[in-house]
Amino acid sequence: MTAVFRVGLVRLVSRATQSPNLLQAQTNALPAAFQQRCSISGKTMRGGPRVPKAAPYPYKTKKYSVFNAIFDKTSKRFDENSKVICVEGPIAAGKSKFAKELAEELDMEYYPAVDLDLIYINSYGYDMRKLDPQLPPSCRSYDVRNFCLDPSHDLAAQFQIRMYMLRYSQYIDALQHVLSTGQGVVLERSPYSDFVFMEAMFRQGYLSRGARSVYNELRQNTIGELLKPHLVIYLDLPVDAVKKQIKARNVDYEVQSKVFSDAYLSDLEQLYKQQYLKDISTHAELLIYDWTAGGETEVVVEDIERIDFNQFEADIHNKKMLDWRFPLEAEWCEARIKYCHEKPDLMNYFNVPRFDVPELVRSADDGKVWRDVWFNAPGMKYRPGYNADMGDEGLLTKTKIGINQGI
């Protein structure tokens, strides 16, 4: 839809941001909307919290469309900390603690690792897993606990595809935040690294070749719509240390799991280092730390502050930071519209018709039972905010649903 309005949007946005006396000068200069004066800085270097250049746009409650873009520019909120940082590493490496501390020091928004609770616990707090006794086996819940205890189950393929979808959805939310507020984000894992788990599961025989094919087709159909991160931080631990950490944090289903064998953990390490980190480093900056004995977030922040992200702007053919190199303000606005206003369209790219993998297909009879049970559960009959039996009020005066609700 945005393409229809592109010409008019470019003219209107440019007219609102350009001075007539500078038109000639700008023909010889790069009108990049996202030019930085310095590198990322932490609170210690700044001497206090980040001061926004402009008030954040309320993207969670207010739509951002072509018409909003005419009056509300995107790049005016950007500063040196308007970045996407992804924290990666093996299981039990200490990513959550580190990512939280990093986000706090850099004054960025923290996005924790996703899990299936985002699907199984609805907006009213009801756990849909309670419905399992009423559902046929193909429609029952299957989350990380189930995977750890029974990794060869037919629903393992669906589990990993759902994890990728959740990471994809969360990454879109993170892009919404950066483009609408100017505040950077720190994510624990990302859709770009999700494939290492799928490949490790396939190598260990937990996924069929057909399920792997479906996953790869879904990934190929969706991943190109996102903007790659500016920085990836990898916390490295050898396999023996990972196993010790899993035992130390004492999560029952992890300790009892047959999944976290030397072979599976070695596959994860190999896939991370030989494929993911190698590929993502062509675009993003990469920092790798030996986290066997933990580490200090302050040291990492100092290393981040030394990175000159602006050095790649001079060469327009350099692949580094290429996804974030938009020369026109209108292009920034279009990217923001894409992630803020058109998220449902992006999620629809997962609708790839593949019916040749039995474990990813449920029968019509099972599907009917699932619909009848699922959508009669507490809080599931109508959209959130419209369920009178759950205490929602003012139904007669409500005329619209929330932004991104139900996605």
Swiss-Prot record:
User: Which Gene3D superfamilies does the annotation name?
Assistant: P-loop containing nucleotide triphosphate hydrolases
Null-mutant phenotype, please?
A: RNAi-mediated knockdown leads to loss of ND-30 and reduced mitochondrial membrane respiratory chain NADH dehydrogenase (Complex I) activity. Larvae exhibit elevated reactive oxygen species (ROS) and an up-regulation of Hsp60. RNAi-mediated knockdown in the eye results in retinal degeneration exacerbated with aging and accompanied by high levels of ROS and accumulation of lipid droplets in the glia. RNAi-mediated knockdown in neurons results in lipid droplet accumulation and increased levels of peroxidated lipids.
Q: In which tissues is it expressed?
A: Expressed in muscles (at protein level).
Its localization reads: Mitochondrion matrix; Cytoplasm
Q: Name one GO biological process term.
A: mitochondrial electron transport, NADH to ubiquinone
Cofactor(s) recorded in Swiss-Prot or TrEMBL: FAD
Pfam families from the xrefs?
dNK
Per the UniProt entry, the effect of S281A is:
Does not rescue the phenotype of Pink1-null mutants which are unable to maintain neurotransmitter release at neuromuscular junctions (NMJ) during high-frequency stimulation (10 Hz). Rescues the climbing deficit of Pink1-null mutants
**How is the cofactor bound, as the UniProt entry phrases it?**
Binds 1 FAD per subunit.
Q: Which UniProt keywords apply?
A: Cytoplasm, Electron transport, FAD, Flavoprotein, Mitochondrion, Respiratory chain, Transit peptide, Transport
Residue span of the annotated presequence: 1-60
Q: What are the annotated GO cellular component locations?
A: cytoplasm; mitochondrial inner membrane; mitochondrial matrix; mitochondrion; respiratory chain complex I
Q: Cite the SUPFAM superfamilies for this sequence.
A: P-loop containing nucleoside triphosphate hydrolases (SSF52540)
Purpose of the protein: Accessory subunit of the mitochondrial membrane respiratory chain NADH dehydrogenase (Complex I), that is believed not to be involved in catalysis. Complex I functions in the transfer of electrons from NADH to the respiratory chain. The immediate electron acceptor for the enzyme is believed to be ubiquinone.
Q: How does it assemble?
A: Complex I is composed of 45 different subunits. This a component of the hydrophobic protein fraction. Forms a complex including sicily, ND-42 and Hsp83; the complex is necessary to chaperone ND-42 in the cytoplasm before mitochondrial import; the interaction between sicily and ND-42 is direct and occurs preferably between the unprocessed forms in the cytoplasm.
Family, according to the entry, reads as follows: Belongs to the complex I NDUFA10 subunit family.
Name of the protein in question: NADH dehydrogenase [ubiquinone] 1 alpha subcomplex subunit 10, mitochondrial
